[in-house]
Amino acid sequence: MSTSTATAQNLSFVLEGIHQVKFEDRPIPELKDPHDVLVNVKFTGICGSDVHYWEHGSIGQFVVKDPMVLGHESSGVISKVGSAVTGLKVGDRVAMEPGIPCRRCEPCKAGKYNLCEKMAFAATPPYDGTLAKFYVLPEDFCYKLPDNISLQEGALMEPLGVAVHIVRQASVTPGQSVIVFGAGPVGLLCCAVAKAFGAAKIIAVDIQKPRLDFAKRYAATSTFEPAKVSAVDNADRLRKENNLGVGADVVIDASGAEPSVHTGIHVLRPGGTYVQGGMGRSEIMFPIMAACTKELTFKGSFRYGSGDYKLAVGLVASGRVNVKDLITGVVEFHDAEQAFKEVKAGKGIKTLIAGIQD
């Protein structure tokens, strides 16, 4: 990890194996298509998936077999544009959507490109991520930031896009009650988006009191710390303490924890909607009887799709969602590994890594 930032062309933070990272100077990527742009990356957030690859070397079927650049929550400044680019120019500040679909398969043509089987997603093996000085994207996957959104905030458009997709999957409407399990970055942003969509009650659930305290200050109308009792008992408490009557309209799970899934199913009203946004173990026990007899709508949510990033930028630009308060630390590029260690230790909410300084 000794490569000099002063002489490097495209210094990159590379994962070689479990807890094995290095700074490597790589060639500046070429524009492969006339619609491509070269982005000078300015800020990158550390995501739980990045930490998981660093800790375990894999996520499910995605295994790091070759050295891979980490990072996918980024913002930057346009450094070069292809000959067919019309919507961006050198110097524009952008949020970067880090997955490129094939654009030809049925999900892509149906507007669900997040389900594309040929998706080239940053920092998902075998594709390199954005923790480098430069990164290439198609122009339509770069979203120009208005003047009132900073580049630091721009890096949070990625997790906000995830939250927007989850809340849209839930079809949250004004006046509804929404329970969000998991008060990490995505769960907190789900609370904020649900509030922007007009939800009347937004209840954040977590086992860590500091997270709940922040959630209450941030966007939740109330919070709930589960007791070490059955899911049915926790659901009963949730309903009574929050005057939910027969149950909540919407449950969003951003934790992936099996007890949260169980409690979420039991706390919903008949005909309610459940959206699974958090990933945990690949298989869990599931309260199928409650789901069936209450005729619940159950949906999964994966990354983000058509319109989600645009809406995310719009929510922040209009002041309806605040992402600035989630940024609890910014470190220099050469301290990237230490930042990963701190995130793994649960310090802060969202840590950003600053890009290479010219």
From Swiss-Prot:
Its domain of life?
Answer: Eukaryota
Identify the cofactor(s): Zn(2+)
Q: Which residues bind Zn(2+)?
A: 47, 72-73
Manner of cofactor binding, per the entry note: Binds 1 zinc ion per subunit.
Instruction: Give the EC number(s) under which this enzyme is classified.
Output: 1.1.1.9
User: Which PROSITE patterns does the UniProt entry name for this protein?
Assistant: ADH_ZINC
Molecular function via GO: D-xylulose reductase activity; L-iditol 2-dehydrogenase (NAD+) activity; zinc ion binding
Task: Name the enzyme group at the top EC level.
Answer: oxidoreductase
Annotated metabolic or biological route of this protein: Carbohydrate degradation; L-arabinose degradation via L-arabinitol; D-xylulose 5-phosphate from L-arabinose (fungal route): step 4/5
Q: Where does NAD(+) bind?
A: 182-187
Family per record: Belongs to the zinc-containing alcohol dehydrogenase family.
What functional role does this protein have? Xylitol dehydrogenase which catalyzes the conversion of xylitol to D-xylulose. Xylose is a major component of hemicelluloses such as xylan. Most fungi utilize D-xylose via three enzymatic reactions, xylose reductase (XR), xylitol dehydrogenase (XDH), and xylulokinase, to form xylulose 5-phosphate, which enters pentose phosphate pathway.
The name of this protein is Probable D-xylulose reductase A
The organism's taxonomy opens as: Eukaryota, Fungi, Dikarya, Ascomycota, Pezizomycotina
